[in-house]
C-alpha cells in the first residue's frame, strides 16, 4: 500500500526571497535519544551525511523538493548531495516550459499569500510524489498542483528523466527504516539555488 503524508498547513506569506522555510525527512540515528544526533546529506556540524528528503523548501516566490540518497555532486543521474530535484522560482519557467508565476507565488494557482497544503505520497518502490493544494473560496473549488514526481526528477541537468531504480530502492529502504521530520526557517545572503 502507498503511504501518504499530509504535512501541516504551510503559510509562507511572510517568508520573502533570501529565506527558506523547510520541512524535510532525515535518516537520523538514535532519534529517540537526547543529544547531538542531527544529520543531513550535507553533514552539517561535522555529522556524517545521511539520507534526506526535502519535502518542501521555499518562500512566497520559490519552492524546491529534493531527494538526496548518496554523497557526491553534479548532474550525474544520482540522487546525490545536489539531488533529484524540482525547483520553481530560480527560472521563469519550469523544465516543462510552464510559467512558474502562474503555478506558484502571489496570485498563482497556488497563491502564496494564503496558506496551502503539502502532501507527499511514498510508493513501495521508492517513488515519491508531492502535491500542493489550496481551497479557492471565491471559485468554490480546490486547486491541486503535482509539484514533485520521481518520474521526472532524475538529476540529469534540467532534463526531465526518472529517478534511477537504485535511488528509488535507497529511498524505499530509508523510508522503511524510519526517518525523522525536521522543520526549519533560515535566511542567507545567497539563496540563489532557490530564489
Each predicted region: which residue ranges?
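GH16 jelly-roll
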Residues: 1-195
